[in-house]
């Protein structure tokens, strides 16, 4: 879009920013013609298909970042890809390998961003998933740590209903987090129960008046 590119260039100039070069080109042609080495490539594929239809699979986005990734990796040590908030986490590891880091960012109870950090080094650390609640903190879980077969047994009565942050639910980390803090997880993406209120729960805490 030449108009948007021109507007961005003018805005950078008005702000006194001189270290940004605006290039209006297709991602495929730019990567092919780029002769340097970048510290990082940030890709935000357009998630609109024919007829302005929303798409979620990377193969349907523009550019097709999965097909373009080998060429990008030749030009940078690190690639960060922005995905749809609806994008499946397991699919990210299937497409980009088991050494990626997936950040799931929420704000005010809504999943806002899914960011996939793809390293180029073959000896990069094992992959991980990070749940980030804007303004509240983050939790990191290694991809290969394994999920506990179950958390603590269901033994009512409980004193508190714990509602995990949506980023934990999206990452399917509720049971692993429950095992970490010693509470009972009803499901992989649902709520938890605890006899005592955790000191710092990654979500919301409600007292239970009575359990039938």
Question: Where are each of the predicted segments found?
Answer:
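SAM-dependent transferase fold signal centered on methyltransferase-like domains
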Residues: 1-212
């Amino acid at each position: 879009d030449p108009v948007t590119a021109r507007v961005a260039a003018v805005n950078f100039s008005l702000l006194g920013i001189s270290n940004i070069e605006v290039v209006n080109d297709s991602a495929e042609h730019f990567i092919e013609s780029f002769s340097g080495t970048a510290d990082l490539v940030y890709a935000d594929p357009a998630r609109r298909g024919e007829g302005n239809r929303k798409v979620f699979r990377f193969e349907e986005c523009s550019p097709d970042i999965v097909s373009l990734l080998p060429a990008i990796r030749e030009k940078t040590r690190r690639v960060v890809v922005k995905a749809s908030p609806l994008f499946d986490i397991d699919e990210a590891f299937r497409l980009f390998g088991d050494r990626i880091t997936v950040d799931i960012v929420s704000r005010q109870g809504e999943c806002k961003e899914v960011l996939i950090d793809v390293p180029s080094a073959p000896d990069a650390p094992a992959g991980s998933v990070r749940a980030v609640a804007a303004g509240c903190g983050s939790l990191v879980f290694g991809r290969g740590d394994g999920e506990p077969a179950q958390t603590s047994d269901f033994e009512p009565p409980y004193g508190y209903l714990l509602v995990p942050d949506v980023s934990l639910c999206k990452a399917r980390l509720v049971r692993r987090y429950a095992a970490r803090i010693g509470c009972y997880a009803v499901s992989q993406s649902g709520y938890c129960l605890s006899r005592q209120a955790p000191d710092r729960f990654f979500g919301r805490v409600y007292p239970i008046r009575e359990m039938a």
